[in-house]
Amino acid sequence: MQIQENISLKTYNTFGIDAKARWFAEFANVEQLNELLSLSIQHLSSNIQHFILGGGSNILFTSDINSLVLKNEVFGIEKIREDEDHVYIKTGAGENWHRFVLHCIENNWAGVENLSLIPGNVGASPMQNIGAYGVELKSVFQELEAFHLQEKTNYVFGLKDCEFDYRQSVFKERYTNQFVIMNVTFRLNKKPVFNTSYGAVEQELEKMGVKELSIAAISQAVINIRSSKLPDPAVIGNAGSFFKNPIVPRGIFEDLQKNHPGIIGFDNNEGNIKLAAAWLIEQCGWKGYRKGDAGCHANQALVLVNYGNASGAEIFELSEQILQSVKAKFGVVLEREVNIVSREA
């Protein structure tokens, strides 16, 4: 275990941005993390900043990072208990999310099949309350263990402690860079409750010729849909959906409908309407746009891409232009789903 200097992060982020970390190290457990923190203070700087890196699938580096980047390599999937209806699976934060989902399906543990093929690691899943096709992480979340970087103490966070919301949790803003998520425990169902409420999933299942519904079939349907709409980061650098779908009061949505009859919105069951950000962006003419190696994907306007050698700053500037144009045309303020990481991370 050692601390390296001036390491390229190009292969550690799905955008493929060639930012450099001033210092870089990996840890596989709390003991190694503690040792690295002590070493960094003793030998590098007493006020050194630390940045925790997971799968690198939801970040955009806009510059080199003048911090110690600590790569989370905590692995392991363990069934810790079960009852008549549920199994409780404790999973290392460094585990790949999609591989974890496939492991659950192989064991007939239900609840995460709709979240298939979401990029990133398990540790990031509660940070942003990942969700897709009618399911959010919070519906299968039991608890997580996290290590406080300053106090050097372990904490357990339950469902209420995490304050989950749409693509949001306490770790994304309030506790940014204060805690390291070490593992997450999921409560999965022994008796599946299928969720095919999204039309695209039902259509894909029909296209697949599925006669008997199963979690494996739903997972494959989701994989097919995502593969057809979203570019593979191994081929074209991207972080999936760059923007959140904005939520507006019903009255605002009705006003928007008068001026923009084709606007797409979905009831979020809380009296508000979730707008389709991709539609807003497409109406502003950004779908398929490219300047240099930074662009907006031709098949999915929510996805910003690096066609090769774009800098993080160039992609960020493109996102700024998109935000401004959507606000000017619709009066709607988009939020980035991707975390922006600058020099002093």
Across the structure, where does each feature detected by a protein language model lie?
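Phosphate/pyrophosphate- and phosphate-bearing ligand-binding catalytic cores of soluble enzymes
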Residues: 3-5, 10-17, 59, 154-304, ...
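Anion-binding (especially nucleotide phosphate/pyrophosphate-binding) glycine-rich loop
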Residues: 1-151
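Beta-rich strand-turn-strand
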Residues: 109, 312-318
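Residue-level preference for nonpolar/small residues embedded in alpha-helices
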Residues: 32, 96, 273, 318-319
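A generic alpha-helix structural signal
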Residues: 33-40, 101, 202, 219-222, ...
